[in-house]
Amino acid sequence: EYAIKSFVAATKALKEGIVDVLVTAPINKYNIQSESFKFPGHTDYLAQELEGDALMLMVSDNLRVGLLTDHVPLNEVAGHLTEELIKKKIETVKQSLIRDFSINKPKIAVLGLNPHCGDGGVIGSEDDAVLKPTLKKIFDKGTLVFGPFPADSFFGSNHYEKYDAIIATYHDQGLIPFKTLSFGRGVNYTAGLDKV
C-alpha cells in the first residue's frame, strides 16, 4: 500500500515541478492492484500521467533495449504489432537516443517476432507481413533502422554492439538478454516523456 502511495505522490510532485527527476524501485505488480490503480507497472502509469509516448528502455553502460510491447501476454503480442505501433515506438527510441543520450544519427536494430524471423512464412507471417515492410518505410524516410533480426543469435554473436539501441518485439525477448549482459548494472529508463 505504501509503495503505490509513494509512487503516486512522487509522480504528482514531478508533474508539479516540486522534484526534477523521478527514480523508482521495483514494485510487486500483483500487490499494487486496486480500484484506484489498475496498471501493470510504472511505465503504464507514467504514460497516463505525463506528456509523451512512454517506452520501456533498458539501459546499461553499453546496451540499450527498448520494447515494442511491454506487459502484454505472449499469446497477444502478434495482435499488437501494427505498423502504427512500430513506427511510434521506433520514433520514440530514436528521439530519446538523440535528446537523452546525445547520439545524433542513432542506429537501431529490431528483433523479429518468430523463430528465425519466420523463415519466409514457414514459422509465422508477422515478420514478412508487418515488420519488414514497416521497417523499410521507416528506413526510406531517413531513420537508420535495421532488421528484423533473428533474436536467438543476435545477442550471443555480439551483433548488438553495432547498434545504439535494440528494439525487441516483446518483454522477455529483450529483458532476458539485457539482464544477462548487464550483470545487474542496468536500469529501466522510461523514455519518450516530458519528464525524467
Regions found by a protein language model. Name each.
Residues 1-126, 131-196:
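Anion-binding alpha/beta catalytic cores of soluble intermediary-metabolism enzymes, centered on
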